Amino acid sequence: MARLLNRWHLPALVRRHYSSRFQSLRIEKTQSPKPLPDSTELQFGRSFTGKYPSQTRNHILKLEWTTTQGWSDAQITPYDNLRLDPASCVLHYAFTCFEGMKAYKDPHGNARLFRPEENLARLNRSAARLALPTFEESGVLEFLAKYVDLEKRFIPHLPGHSLYLRPTLLGTDASISVSRPRSALLFVIASPMGDYFANGMKAVTLQATRSPVRAWPGGVGEFKVGGNYAPSIVPQEEAAEAGSQQNLWLLADRESGEEFVTEAGTMNLFVVWVSSSTGKKELVTPPLDGTILPGVTRMSILELARERLEGDRSGIEVVERRITMRELAAASKEGRLLEVFGAGTAVVVSPVRSIRWGDQCISCGLRDGEEAGPMSLQMKTWLEEVQYGLVEHPWR
């Protein structure tokens, strides 16, 4: 199975479908620039620089691809609707993958991207898995930087605010044949975003969900493809009806019956506990076994923790291993479960108060009146210090 999963990570697979090098970028600026939105009214994913709150336009970055011509020159044009043939393969077979990124403003008013090369590399891996064309990452990054520079006035110069970027690649081939697309479109849109926790962090409750399953061995759970997301909406609504804010996606082992933790909603999951075997404090997250999305925030938390916590007086060990629900329940009952939190681009860090698992409610270490534990707060602080340019770091 390892060979099956690892083959999608081979750089050669990504490079194989480079059809041309990018030549140039054409910029057509809008003649009716959109007014800046009220930062208090920003809604994640709904406040776009081209559509909100009026019908004036700003910009979209687009690159087209065909099997005969390869990648076209990049274009930044006034924001407008896409034009797709009703037979476009994306509409029938979900030939689409995407990324979530953010641009920030540093104390000097400069726009900053956080580890964009990691997002573009992941987008290429997703594209290769879906038989979509891959691209030269350095070229797209250059165009993306120019797009952000053009839209940077939409980045609120306020703590916790940013400009959310959505690079999307989709197959546009007008064919209902189930085959490799002969044409595709890569585009980027931007959405101003307020502080996810405008009134301070708020811990959530998760609903442990064994069925339906979000991802399985040999599937596409490790790729950011559109088909992974629509099927999660009904289970999320069911979790909300049961009093939880998100699902905790489980993967059950048929032989042992053990239920393994994978992701929390659309976030990677982290656990802070005292190990039952060593008595040491650990920061644990499930490994990248093909069912877990390799989140950029996840990777950054692991790197920061290893850089600043391991070997420190804190005595925390950073561990990537499978976690079972039985272990979580036992750690909570024995007072060893100190914190649980999710991590992702949109939310950065999201503390978890409890997990509903069957007829059990597993307490995740927070005291009454406490909305976040020390590790959650520390990781959020460290990440945002780098993202907003408040400290020197190689990721800059």
From Swiss-Prot:
Its EC number is 2.6.1.-. It comes from the Eukaryota. SUPFAM superfamilies: D-aminoacid aminotransferase-like PLP-dependent enzymes. Its cofactor is pyridoxal 5'-phosphate. InterPro entries: Aminotrans_IV, Aminotrans_IV_CS, Aminotransferase-like, B_amino_transII, BCAT-like_C, BCAT-like_N, BCAT_family. Pathway: Secondary metabolite biosynthesis. One of its GO terms (biological process) is L-leucine biosynthetic process. Keywords: Amino-acid biosynthesis, Aminotransferase, Branched-chain amino acid biosynthesis, Pyridoxal phosphate, Transferase. The modification N6-(pyridoxal phosphate)lysine is found at residue 224. Disruption phenotype: Eliminates approximately 40% of aspercryptin production. CDD domains: BCAT_beta_family. Pyridoxal 5'-phosphate binds at residue 122. Induction: Expression is positively regulated by the aspercryptin cluser-specific transcription factor atnN. It holds the Pfam family Aminotran_4. GO terms for molecular function: branched-chain-amino-acid transaminase activity. GO terms for cellular component: mitochondrion. NCBIfam families: ilvE_II (TIGR01123), PRK13357.1 (NF009897). Branched-chain-amino-acid aminotransferase; part of the gene cluster that mediates the biosynthesis of aspercryptins, linear lipopeptides built from six amino acids including 2 highly unusual and nonproteogenic amino acids, 2-amino-octanoic acid (2aoa) and 2-amino-dodecanol (2adol). The core structure of aspercryptins is as follows: Ser/Ala-Thr-Ile/Val-2aoa-Asn-2adol. The first step of aspercryptin biosynthesis is the generation of the fatty acid precursors, octanoic and dodecanoic acids, by the FAS subunits atnF and atnM. Belongs to the class-IV pyridoxal-phosphate-dependent aminotransferase family. This is Branched-chain-amino-acid aminotransferase atnH. It comes from Emericella nidulans (strain FGSC A4 / ATCC 38163 / CBS 112.46 / NRRL 194 / M139) (Aspergillus nidulans).
